[in-house]
């Protein structure tokens, strides 16, 4: 006997299979999703660990300590999971300079699944060295550079209650921010990190122009390509070109943090601290890059003006400092003095002229 083919039943089976496929795909995507850096909304959390030992640990390779991270979900549920916490960095770990060190928080992926920290492994947590406001200003600089290129580290501002398990007391509650792991940046941009020896001449030219001018704009000279100081280099899988990604902006003149000021130096120097460390581009190349930053000026101003965690006085100072950059690039004499007279050549790197 010949069985009749039912279009309705066949369509139903296809629909069920497709729905199952979508559900499975969504589950896989959810497991991969980086939810932490998808929002700028500030949320509060409590970080518990042996901060007495962490603050005292000045060893070259600091020890990780057991900890707990606790926060409330949007539904009001208490989310709690285990972490490892250790001090990181060099300069800011000095207790004579900073009252509290920057941290590295190590997550267990199986514990943070389906939380805001889904898919996180190790994250840098930037803490207040001295003034809490400095942290928020550095956060704003990261957000400014996010406007320059997607090849940049994302950040998330949080309010953290630090609890010392050694003394069973609160240390303090302060604003801090997490920095995206470089592996996630690489995945977003279809790139991979490179740790070979490079000079600025090996990098994508447009990328390095934007990096060097941005560092000048914020007044940060605490970076080098060759030694990879506060710079990560990635190679694009698509273009095979090398791209520099800057980080650690706390020495920027835009912030003007007290611990970054050298002694016995004039206030005039301290008020600018701008040193161009880019290459000797053509005037046309400079012109195109300056025009790129002119278009970003209202965006930068808005990021500063709308950050109400920074005092009005400091925001005005930040805006004046930003305006100083735009005045310089509009003045031919200052442009020559600040850029053309100090830019780096191939000879400085013992490279043959092309």
Language-model regions: role of each:
Residues 1-31:
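Bacterial Sec-dependent N-terminal signal peptides
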Residues 31-354:
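Phosphate/dinucleotide-binding and metal-coordinating scaffold of catalytic cores
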